[in-house]
């Protein structure tokens, strides 16, 4: 019986090569590998070919020994007790009851309004997948802000109303008109990367003014300014969602554990699209310990220390900007954003001294650099470096 040809029609941009089998380099039945540089492009969703992926601190990389570009905690916390890993051969609970209970006790939000996720990033994606129709619906953001809202939307072919914050980094006067029609309206508070905050009353106005949208308040850094949280408004407003994470104040960025807080109707929809096992057993164990009384006490102590070091760094940056031109925004998270008239000079100064901070391509942040708060040792070096530039 004759064998049909592998390819009856010529294919463009295709390379066919022979790969020796594992048994013998001279085996006549060598494996045939067809390589095509355009196969993925031909099969991919067209909108993804134009998508620029989110440039995380890890993707951007850098060289140095002081890493203050990702708003990570300098504290490498070990577990406060023994981890129970005796069930690693079994799939974990979708929503580990002990973890949900621990976060409920910490946040004051009832368990039925909590979903645990792989960081707040997954929660953002879940909301877009659950509520936005690709090619039809849109989200709204107020920038400059965290880039993953827009990236997640674009990944699912959901439109983005990229609105601007006011000159004072608050919600603009026409926010309700500008955001109207968006299924999801994202407000980052404290805002990343500016570190600025929006008053609780102003956010409540937004929730009231957009009854047909879900207002998503990202509180990733709320432990640094808890008085600005709107989690207590969940009982009042069915269109409010609050995002939280253990990556920042709890120093568990590597664990990837976040929470979505919302009314039960929204939670029920989210649970329809969430992965069956989103929280690995070791992550749940570590997170539960972080949310124990001892873990929370440690977090609060570390937040206080980070705020102290942040105040020192902000003061040094202010002195530099007074002499060389620029401005420093008042920090409310574990980072501070400074705008420099001589930003290229500052960037080189940091690079030459092994310091990796965060710069931006956004035109609104062309002169800005964000500095994460770090240890006393790191802060000593930063303060000394900027003080050495005195005229």
Swiss-Prot record:
Q: What is its EC number?
A: 2.6.1.9
What are the UniProt keywords, alphabetically?
Answer: Amino-acid biosynthesis, Aminotransferase, Histidine biosynthesis, Pyridoxal phosphate, Transferase
- Asked if the Swiss-Prot or TrEMBL record annotates the protein with the keyword Glycoprotein, the reply is no
Give residues where N6-(pyridoxal phosphate)lysine occurs.
Answer: 248
Name of the protein described by the UniProt record = Histidinol-phosphate aminotransferase
Hey, which family's this protein in? Belongs to the class-II pyridoxal-phosphate-dependent aminotransferase family. Histidinol-phosphate aminotransferase subfamily.
One Gene Ontology term from the biological process aspect of the record: L-histidine biosynthetic process
Instruction: Decide whether keyword Transmembrane helix is in the record.
Output: no
Q: Which PROSITE patterns match?
A: AA_TRANSFER_CLASS_2 (PS00599)
Q: Which CDD domains match?
A: AAT_like
Q: Which cofactor does it need?
A: pyridoxal 5'-phosphate
Disulfides per UniProt: none
This chain is encoded by the gene named hisC
Domain of life assignment: Bacteria
The UniProt catalytic activity note for this protein reads: L-histidinol phosphate + 2-oxoglutarate = 3-(imidazol-4-yl)-2-oxopropyl phosphate + L-glutamate
| Stored NCBIfam families | hisC
The record's note on quaternary structure and interaction partners says:
Homodimer.
Which pathway does it take part in? Amino-acid biosynthesis; L-histidine biosynthesis; L-histidine from 5-phospho-alpha-D-ribose 1-diphosphate: step 7/9
């Amino acid at each position: 019986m004759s064998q049909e040809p592998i390819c009856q029609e010529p294919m463009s941009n295709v390379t066919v090569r022979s790969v020796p089998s594992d048994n013998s380099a001279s085996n006549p039945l060598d494996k045939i590998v067809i390589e095509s540089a355009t196969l993925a492009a031909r099969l991919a969703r067209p909108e993804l070919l134009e998508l620029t992926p989110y440039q995380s601190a890890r993707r951007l990389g850098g060289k140095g020994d002081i890493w203050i570009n990702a708003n990570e905690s300098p504290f490498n916390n070990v577990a406060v007790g023994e981890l129970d890993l005796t069930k690693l051969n079994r799939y974990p609970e979708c929503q580990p009851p002990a973890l949900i209970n621990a976060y409920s006790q910490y946040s004051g939000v009832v368990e039925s309004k909590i979903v645990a996720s792989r960081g707040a990033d997954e929660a953002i994606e879940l909301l877009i997948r659950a509520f936005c129709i690709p090619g039809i619906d849109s989200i709204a953001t107020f920038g400059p802000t965290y880039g993953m809202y827009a990236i997640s939307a674009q990944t699912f072919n959901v439109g983005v109303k990229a609105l601007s914050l006011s000159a004072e980094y608050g919600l603009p006067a026409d926010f309700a008109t500008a955001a109207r029609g968006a299924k999801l309206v994202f407000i980052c508070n404290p805002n990343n990367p500016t570190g600025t905050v929006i008053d609780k009353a102003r956010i409540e106005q937004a929730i009231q003014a957009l009854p047909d949208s879900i207002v998503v308040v990202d509180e990733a850094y709320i432990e640094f300014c808890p008085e600005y949280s709107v989690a207590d408004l969940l009982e009042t407003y069915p269109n409010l969602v609050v995002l939280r994470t253990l990556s920042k104040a709890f120093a568990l960025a590597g664990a990837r554990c976040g929470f979505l807080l919302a009314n039960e109707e929204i939670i029920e929809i989210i649970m329809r699209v969430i992965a069956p096992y989103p929280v690995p057993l070791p992550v749940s164990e570590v997170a539960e310990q972080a949310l124990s009384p001892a873990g929370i006490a440690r977090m609060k102590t570390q937040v206080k220390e980070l705020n102290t070091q942040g105040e020192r760094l902000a003061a040094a940056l202010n002195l530099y900007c007074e002499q060389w031109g620029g401005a420093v925004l008042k920090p409310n998270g574990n980072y501070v954003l400074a705008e420099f008239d001589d930003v290229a000079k500052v960037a080189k100064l940091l690079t030459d001294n092994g310091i990796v901070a965060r710069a931006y391509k956004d035109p609104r942040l062309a002169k800005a650099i964000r500095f994460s708060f770090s240890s006393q040792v790191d802060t000593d070096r930063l303060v000394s470096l900027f003080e050495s530039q005195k005229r």
